[in-house]
């Protein structure tokens, strides 16, 4: 077993990725951007699911993939109106598997990734609500701020959850 410790100069990193390029192991550590103004950020928006991956089905028969795409396109328009550079996983109805998503984000280097999903439950009458998920502890305040704004819409609380592993096992 080989153990490598990397001591960082900055207080909090904005994520990391570990991957191979040929026989080389690459460790990329992301730092906070100099400016946190929306006009200075690059934000990736992932419209969850798509194509043959329909996601959750609602009581009315509406598919998650359609709602996530519609919400993502509205979010794209709102953020672009504020001057934010947006990178979209998909802008139309198509399949985009998780491996493709991981490679897409790894290569495009967004400052933030917002992945839009809706969940289902075996008992949708009793189990409902909105939640946010973040991967790195440094993103908890941002995730919580988004969560609090969502609650202002009158949505039921389902929590701000950490250690979300969307890219944890990336190639």
Regions of interest found by a model, annotated:
Residues 35-61, 114:
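Catalytic-core environment of secreted peptidases
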